[in-house]
Amino acid sequence: MRTRIFGRTWLSAVPMLIVLALILSACSGGKSATSSSGTGGMDHGNAGSSPSSSAPFDQQFIDMMVPHHMGAVAMAQIALTRAEHPELKTLANGIIASQNSEIGRMKQWRAAWYGSDQTPPMDQMRMLPGMDMNMMNGGMMSSDIKNMQTASPFDRAFLQAMIPHHQSAIAGAKLEQEQGMHPELKQLAGTIIADQQKEIDQMQQWLKAWYP
């Protein structure tokens, strides 16, 4: 419909308010969609326009890996009470211990190198330069954590989620080894690759054995 406000066609007060409301709603909706993921997934689509995209690569790596680790820890904590197989609970305890330790180290480095230890929340985690959506498909979101609380059989759902989650962490860690500047962070990336590949191999074996 075409409406002229300053022409021969005059709008009544009520239609004018409706038009203005629609315009304001569209503007605010577009802004919120680019600035926050809300209840959706990781904010991949605007990585190129994000102010953090011009940050040093090590900072971007920390800002990706910390919330990525938090997702793994959150899911592993659920496994402590829901897992059927005791070996999966043992793995979950290991994930919680190792990744919480790595989160602490990365936050300390971020504060020392970039003035703050604050990293994005899990649902606003962004891709690293050089990563594509396939690499980040395993990124954990709050909705995934919620679904895991009722998944059945839990152990299969856990393995099917944690394997690609580890794979995406390895992809990011390899980029850190290639493009990072701080040797201690590159060394941590090597640890992530080695430890999580070992866990992937174990989880894949369990998946085949328990759910052929």
Regions found by a protein language model. Give the residues of each.
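All-alpha RGS (Regulator of G-protein Signaling) helical domain and cognate RGS-like helical scaffolds
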Residues: 29-212
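Bacterial N-terminal signal peptides that target proteins for export
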Residues: 3-16
